[in-house]
Design a protein with these regions (language model features):
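Terminal targeting signals and extreme-terminal segments of soluble enzymes
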Residues: 1-131
Length: 131
């Protein structure tokens, strides 16, 4: 896997998501949730974890050939395994399961300090670079 440097989306900047590494068909992203991302119980809100997983899966699609120039999720399923604490770094590892001409299926694991927080799967509409 490589350690890329590139411009990220405004949503990634707002959430504090950072691209850690990519490989063919995979991407790792991280974020460290802040207190304003907590739910009423004081744990990280599930929507923040969902956004992180969606970001990892979408970014993994940008690593395949022919190149994907746009990926938009139209189905996202999450299973929450354990609570995430504010201030602990969450690492999401996304991977491409299958990519056709117009749609792709992906999967993701979200972990905190080696502990599984959530698993996810997603289906994306993709636009590929013309060959």
């Amino acid at each position: 896997m490589s350690s890329p440097t590139e411009v990220v989306s405004p949503a990634w900047q707002w959430l504090g998501i950072e691209l850690v590494e990519t490989g063919e068909g995979s991407a790792v992203v991280e974020m460290t949730p802040t207190a304003d991302m907590a739910n009423h119980a004081g744990f990280v809100h599930g929507g923040m974890i969902s956004a992180l997983a969606d970001s990892a899966m979408g970014r993994s699609l940008r690593t395949i050939k022919p190149a994907v120039v746009r990926a938009m999720s139209f189905d996202l399923k999450l299973s929450f395994i354990s609570a995430a604490k504010v201030g602990e770094t969450l690492r999401a590892t996304g991977g491409v399961v299958h990519a056709g001409r117009r749609t792709a299926v992906t999967e993701c694991r979200v972990e905190a300090a080696g502990r599984l927080v959530a698993t996810a799967s997603g289906t994306f509409a993709i636009t590929r670079e013309k060959e």
